[in-house]
From Swiss-Prot:
Residues modified to Phosphoserine: 122, 162, 232, 234, 255, 273, 299
GO biological process: protein import into nucleus
Stated name of the protein: Protein FAM53C
This protein's encoding gene: FAM53C
Amino acid composition bias (Polar residues), ranges on this chain: 83-93
PANTHER family given in the database record: PROTEIN FAM53A-LIKE ISOFORM X1 (PTHR28567), PROTEIN FAM53C (PTHR28567:SF4)
Record's compositionally biased regions (Low complexity): 241-256
GO CC, one annotated term: nucleus
Keyword Acetylation included in the entry's annotation: yes
Residue ranges crossing the lipid bilayer per the database entry: none
Length: 392
């Protein structure tokens, strides 16, 4: 049977509806006797068209059959009969489905959200289309909303009148002492910040329960809240929330105040991109440090360092210049080599000592050394004072 129908569809002419390929699914009914609609498997001649199908009394083309035209084929969907019909009328479907369309003809998916949207703490718009109330994962920071009845003493109940009237809002936990309502006018209380409201038509005011500290919705409404659909961490809309509405442009005053911020930092504005302050500074000017006061070194007197004191050689030269043939008795004492050797280190050591001493003491010791050298040259070396040499 399926082979005959497939061959018949392939031999149709081009002036009729285009039917390239069909996947025909004909579920066989349990009862072979279907008298109301006649034979469910009917053969149509080759010259006949799909539009000339015999009319079925139990189904109407406008009510029960849905024609969906596709560029590559034709689909016929026959709705199953209702449950009130006789058990003989089993639901059957005659579906003619074409091949899946090309991926190029499929609608282009929407572009991914921008980077700014990904960074913001917002809920996508698709959540508003969900039928069940959206609740996040259990956390310490979030608590779900409990809907109370009109008396307020009944147990929590969720309204089931209509899906668009469901209210789903989440907020941070408050202290247990938060037992004020935003509906009465004599109790001015601002709606809580960081509340995530997800409502389409919310006609109930907001109230804070003393047990959980979360904002709830009462059945008693003094004035209906305006319709809202908010997906940001901003104040919830209440009957008197018009004064709490943020401006169109975000400002430091409109942003919520963090409760854990220190007291000194609560009035500080929000951080903005500050202009570069390097232009105000002078470029190319180096900071000159004050020169460190260097300690004054003692000045060295090179004339005094070059002066030679009286020594044995000086005494010998002076006596030779005078031309005296008779040498004094102290010259004979200075002539032996061992004594002259002992005389020369005294002059060298005294000269080294005079160069290493400071300027203040140098002048005093210079005179002492000169006097001692004269006394050394004038007296006999037999009675040399070793203590005097060590001091010099």
């Amino acid at each position: 049977m399926i082979t005959l129908i497939t061959e018949q569809l392939q031999k149709q002419t081009l002036d009729e509806l285009k039917c390239t390929r069909f996947s025909i699914s004909l579920p066989l009914p349990d009862h072979a006797d279907i008298s109301n609609c006649g034979n469910s498997f009917q053969l149509v001649s080759e010259g006949a068209s799909w539009r000339g199908l015999p009319h079925c009394s139990c189904a109407e083309f406008q009510d029960s059959l849905n024609f969906s035209y596709h560029p590559s084929g034709l689909s016929l969907h026959l709705r199953p009969p209702s449950r009130g019909n006789s058990p003989k009328e089993q639901p059957f479907s005659q579906v003619l489905r074409p091949e899946p369309p090309d991926p190029e003809k499929l609608p282009v998916p929407p572009a991914p959200p921008s980077k700014r949207h990904c960074r913001s703490l917002s809920v996508p718009v698709d959540l508003s289309r969900w039928q069940p109330v959206w609740r996040p994962a259990p956390s310490k920071l979030w608590t779900p909303i409990k809907h109370r009845g009109s008396g307020g003493g009944g147990g929590p109940q969720v309204p089931h009148q209509s899906p668009p009237k469901r209210v789903s809002s989440l907020r941070f936990l408050q202290a247990p002492s938060a037992s004020s309502q935003c509906a009465p006018a004599h109790r001015p209380y601002s709606p809580p910040f960081f509340s995530l409201a997800l409502a389409q038509d919310s006609s109930r005011p907001c109230a804070a329960s003393p047990q959980s500290g979360s904002w709830e919705s009462d059945a008693e409404s003094l004035s209906p809240c305006p319709p809202q659909r908010r997906f940001s961490l901003s104040p919830s809309l209440g009957p008197q929330a018009s004064r709490f509405l943020p401006s169109a442009r975000s400002s430091p005053a409109s942003s919520p105040e963090l409760p854990w911020r220190p007291r000194g930092l609560r009035n500080l504005p929000r951080s903005r991109s500050q202009p570069c302050d390097l232009d105000a500074r002078k470029t190319g000017v180096k900071r000159r440090h004050e020169e460190d006061p260097r300690r004054l070194r003692p000045s060295l007197d090179f004339d005094k360092m070059n002066q030679k004191p009286y020594s044995g050689g000086l005494c010998l030269q002076e006596t030779a210049r005078e031309g005296s043939s008779i040498s004094p008795p102290w010259f004979m004492a200075c002539s032996p080599p061992p004594l002259s050797a002992s005389c020369s280190p005294t002059g060298g050591s005294s000269q080294v000592l005079s160069e290493s001493e400071e300027e203040e003491e140098g002048a005093v010791r210079w005179g002492r050394q000169a006097l001692s050298k004269r006394t050394l040259c004038q007296r006999d070396f037999g009675d040399l004072d070793l203590n005097l040499i060590e001091e010099n």
